[in-house]
Amino acid sequence: MGRKRSASSSRWLAEHFKDQFVQKAHKQKLRSRAYFKLDEIQQTDRLFKPGMTVVDLGAAPGGWSQYAVTQIGSKGRIIACDILDMNPIVGVDFLQGDFREESVLNALLERVGDDMVDVVMSDMAPNFSGMPSVDIPRAMYLVELALDMCRQVLAPKGSFVVKVFQGEGFDDYLRDIRAMFTTVKVRKPEASRDRSREVYIVATGYKG
């Protein structure tokens, strides 16, 4: 006898396919609904300009990179990384690997090269177990690594956008970002599901 989906997973699938942003992404042949989250952030915060260099962490399936390419143009460059594979996007240099591993970080830094990065963006998230006591520390570890990446490659006055799940450690993390950047906003894009604990911290004016 085949296994049945749980009530919660069936409910998630029903919500997913009813979601207007999922439908829009499908109609427009976009990689994911995350495209619209970054678009909304760009309309408000103006992170991207033509010719910029961008690092995209947790890039797969490619919604953020796909959007950023439209903003930075052919003279810009995106260096993207994810533990999962991602179909190629013109203008995106993709590295598959676990960003938590030193060897992957070094390979990513090698691809960045001597260029200073204008925007670091992170949509990284762990595989969730459903246990907040486990999931939140895992998620916070990833966003701390993303902030460390800023310290290594971000140009003065550069920008950082990161998905963060509200919970233990969030306030301390926000305080750290405010110490490093001139302007820091917490955004909840319309394309983010209401019941999700995710928010996006948008930080501009890196103090270097």
From Swiss-Prot:
It catalyses: uridine(2552) in 23S rRNA + S-adenosyl-L-methionine = 2'-O-methyluridine(2552) in 23S rRNA + S-adenosyl-L-homocysteine + H(+). It comes from the Bacteria. Its main location: cytoplasm. The gene is rlmE. GO terms for molecular function: rRNA (uridine-2'-O-)-methyltransferase activity. Its EC number is 2.1.1.166. NCBIfam families: PRK11188.1 (NF008390), rrmJ (TIGR00438). The keyword rRNA processing applies. Specifically methylates the uridine in position 2552 of 23S rRNA at the 2'-O position of the ribose in the fully assembled 50S ribosomal subunit. The keyword Cytoplasm applies. This is Ribosomal RNA large subunit methyltransferase E. The active site is at K163 (proton acceptor). One of its GO terms (cellular component) is cytoplasm. S-adenosyl-L-methionine binds at G62, W64, D82, D98, D123.
